[in-house]
């Protein structure tokens, strides 16, 4: 049963108006891939985009994709019904099935990752420029409520909710034109076009956190505040400027901030430090608020010393703050010829040689090598920083250096999912780590 958990200050938009404004905003020509499950939101999005396209057909193509997660007996039939709808509308459609074993725990997250991967595969195959999904203002309320339950502080960046666009796998923009649309209004729109939608019974299963939150929202409405998202983006942009001007990163393994720039009271410093910790530690998320509070207490003393957080070591010295991967739990892996793998969630290693290679933590080199890699860094910092770099060996021989092996820094906080809020910050980090900039959204 639909619920209305609106608060007085929320602004909502009609589905067709949202789709029309979205289409008008896009750079053209463009090819949109619509992710459609058959539910009311994604069905409404497909219909509204087709109607908007009819009014503005200049260089716009539509295709659709359905992911069959194979978690319910009826899912294959539901995917066929979506394919039939798309055929009636004249929209090319692809179904992809999530095959293979399903995890006993963490099923929701595994399903989400599989869904994005399969959708991205289809986008690549058909040459789509972007993907759109049917997330609504109701989904936004649920997201904010779940994040507020974990940390309700005013500095919780999660309270900004979902971004209207997110970059997937550093190459594909997934956009959400319906984030200001109410589900019931979308359903009314679908019905007015004499179309129907499919109801997924898992949307009523209280085993899932989102369902439980959805059921409580009518009694405890969440007020969405657009200014929260604006503040987050402004903080990210100011932090990007701070890092470009003040931070140094050597070989994607060692960061340095001069002592004058270590200012725990400055929001840009705090946010930038959290981003550097996540990137140098190979973590998908910034450190938890409690961890950052511990770091800031340490830095506010102004004393020299060391502490660890998020798999990195912070070394406060008289000349500044050094940040590098701690020497624990560094992995070893083997990569076959022509294969590739991510090492320590920090480096992508591609083996273009004719033989298997082993990748392990680096050895401490000579003083000359250390000085060349990390100029001006103290010896007590250089040695552990060098040990955090990947080193390559032929599987059947000793350590080797080969031009046929490519090592590229990976940015764990941004490479898989990058909200548009954080694009400028991510590009500042990418520049420091010797990576090209992330692509801009197609608007």
UniProtKB/Swiss-Prot annotation:
Gene label: tilS
Domains as described in the record: The N-terminal region contains the highly conserved SGGXDS motif, predicted to be a P-loop motif involved in ATP binding.
Family per similarity comment: Belongs to the tRNA(Ile)-lysidine synthase family.
An annotated GO cellular component: cytoplasm
GO function term, MF aspect, one: tRNA(Ile)-lysidine synthase activity
Entries under PANTHER family matching the protein: TRNA(ILE)-LYSIDINE SYNTHASE-RELATED
Alphabetical GO biological process terms: tRNA modification
Source superkingdom: Bacteria
Coarse class of the protein's main subcellular location: cytoplasm
Catalytic activity entry: cytidine(34) in tRNA(Ile2) + L-lysine + ATP = lysidine(34) in tRNA(Ile2) + AMP + diphosphate + H(+)
Enzyme class: ligase
Coiled-coil regions listed in the entry: none
Record keywords: ATP-binding, Cytoplasm, Ligase, Nucleotide-binding, tRNA processing
Subcellular location field: Cytoplasm
Positions of ATP binding: 37-42
Tagged with keyword Transmembrane: no
Protein's recorded name: tRNA(Ile)-lysidine synthase
EC number: 6.3.4.19
Pfam families: ATP_bind_3 (PF01171)
Record's function text: Ligates lysine onto the cytidine present at position 34 of the AUA codon-specific tRNA(Ile) that contains the anticodon CAU, in an ATP-dependent manner. Cytidine is converted to lysidine, thus changing the amino acid specificity of the tRNA from methionine to isoleucine.
